[in-house]
Amino acid sequence: SQWTYRQDIRNEEQLWKNFKYILEQNNKAKLNDTPLSESEFAKVKNDLSHASFYDAGKWLVGENGKVYVHVQRGNETLHLVVMNNEHIAGGTSVYEVINQYQAFKTEENDERDRRFDVTLLINGIPMIHIELKNKEHSYMDGYRQIKKYIAEGKFRGLFSNIQMFVVSNAVDTKYFSAARDTELNKKFITGWIDEKNYPVCDYMDFAKAVLKIPEAHEMVTKYTVLDNDKKKLLILRPYQIHAIKAMRNASKQGKSGFIWHTTGSGKTMTSYKATRNLLMDIPSIEKTVFLIDRKDLDMQTKMAFQSYADNDTIDVDDTDYVDTLIKRMTDGNRQMIVTTRQKMQTMISNRLKEGTKEYQIIKNLRVAFVVDECHRAVTPETKRKLEQFFNNSLWYGFTDRKSTRLNSSH
């Protein structure tokens, strides 16, 4: 499933019409094969026109991977699925490309129509917008143009759902997350690097690496974080994405390993998204535990994790007491737990009694541990004890010590 070029979608009316068609096709049974009425669709249009890209991001998180719009029909509320983020590269997902779209005239005296270069639609919704320049111009001209369009209010209606921008002059290509014009910052413009750390600058190479399916859909779902404190949309950088993919691939093979990082590399966000994605992507994992040393569990890390999780589809529990940890480990919910190595040790050494129900439940949990600053948070002896206790555990350690750099190990 790749992109279909839709030459026929050039204005707002055609864009909404296309979205309506896809929505109705994907919800035939719920709609009882009766198309949405004008008033029903007016409600949908209103719900999909967001005040900010961040608000759109909150809505696009959905419920258990599904993004809904709710329509009242008689006495019944219809919960229509707009997008299913579990159907990446298949299922109900529809991928389309439009270009030369005529953007809104914001004032009667707009001298000329603004024409957008290229936009990628998922299920009829603009999600990634691309501005292209020729080689004589800098990609920064594309950035400034997008900033101007945002300031002019061009990204509204269905276009208010954009999550990611791409700018290129064919030989230099960058991406950044959608934000208000006053919040856009040059320092968040990011180039792509491949797994071997080589820059990917050419726009066609960038498209193959980042904008094909499933990668493009994953960029705006799996690799986007909503920071509730700052009310900002954040898209991970390439090295963060490669680290998360490596963890996912290792866990599918039942392997553990280390992730090497440098100071200031966005480790908190990488570790959050990695811990979260393991839970979302690997159905066999029942709990993911972000394990940290008591000295390192500062308020900043806890607050950052909570801020990222506030708009996410999973619960993050930071456990203040060992009793709370036991309760979380035995509650049967698939969730992400943030706790300290000391509490985990106390739980298995002093609190759990062999033969009890909670002992059996916790011992047999299929759990993935993500360890922060693993070179000092968990000694080899501690890890051995924890591994001996848990029958089914995987381990991923973040470290800034190059000597421990591994791709994966048993």
Q: What would you call each of these model-derived segments?
A:
Residues 139, 342-356, 362-408:
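Signature of the SF2 helicase/ATPase Hel1-core->accessory helical subdomain module
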Residues 2-287, 296, 300-312, 332-336, ...:
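ATP-dependent helicase/translocase motor core
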Residues 322-337, 361:
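Conserved motor-coupling elements within RecA-like helicase/translocase cores
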Residues 290-292:
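Short beta-strand-centered segment that lines the nucleotide-binding/catalytic pocket of NTP-utilizing
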Residues 5, 312-318, 396-398:
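Acidic/polar loop patches that form or flank catalytic/metal-binding clefts of enzymes
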Residues 294-295, 402:
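Acidic, glycine-rich active-site loops and adjacent beta-strand->loop/helix elements
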Residues 151-167, 318-320, 368-371, 375-376, ...:
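Phosphate/diphosphate-binding loops
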Residues 295, 316-326, 341-346:
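Conserved helicase motor
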